[in-house]
């Protein structure tokens, strides 16, 4: 199933990957600068503050590996600092966009607070940025969720079929 869901023609463009070693406050600037350097239009941003190793083969996806982030405040601040400049660039260029927030797996109180915060961030920003056609969506993996499941959902949301989703949270692996 993954091979058909993640076929290259679903997402056209350039893949950008930035490490969390870049200061979070400068992440958005780095995204915009790198896209300008490549003369690429970035219309999808994936924020992964979980610290998992992320390999991006999908074009027009910016992956942020937040390996150095520890608590819920770091996760939420990092997500906001990554999303805001990208959304600002889309608004200025009058372009739509997808902001995909990948939450950490369930765990202690800090992980649960970060998950709830990212879900609320997606809901709130979907209302604030709907007039600009910017679609924030959160993915909340369960304890037993496989990386392929997250990848398939992310590919679906980044495809034209995912254009109808905004401000929602997808909880994977829960009954």
List each language-model region with its residue ranges.
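C-terminal helical subdomain
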Residues: 81, 131-134, 138-175
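Rossmann-like short-chain dehydrogenase/reductase
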Residues: 2-141, 154
């Amino acid at each position: 199933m993954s091979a058909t869901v993640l076929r290259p023609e679903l997402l056209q463009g350039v893949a950008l990957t930035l490490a969390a070693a870049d200061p979070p406050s400068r992440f958005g600037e780095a995204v915009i600068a790198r896209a300008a350097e490549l003369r690429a239009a970035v219309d999808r941003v994936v924020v992964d503050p979980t610290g998992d190793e992320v390999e991006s083969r999908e074009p027009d996806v910016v992956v942020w590996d937040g390996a150095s982030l520890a608590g819920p405040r770091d996760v939420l601040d990092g997500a906001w600092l990554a999303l805001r400049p990208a959304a600002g660039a889309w608004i200025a260029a009058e372009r739509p966009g997808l902001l995909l927030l990948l939450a950490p797996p369930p765990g202690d109180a800090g992980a649960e607070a970060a998950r709830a915060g990212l879900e609320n961030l997606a809901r709130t920003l979907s209302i604030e940025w709907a007039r600009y056609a910017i679609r924030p969506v959160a993915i909340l993996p369960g304890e037993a969720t496989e990386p392929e499941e997250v990848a398939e959902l992310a590919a679906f949301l980044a495809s034209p079929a995912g254009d109808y989703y905004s401000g929602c949270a997808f909880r994977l692996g829960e009954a």
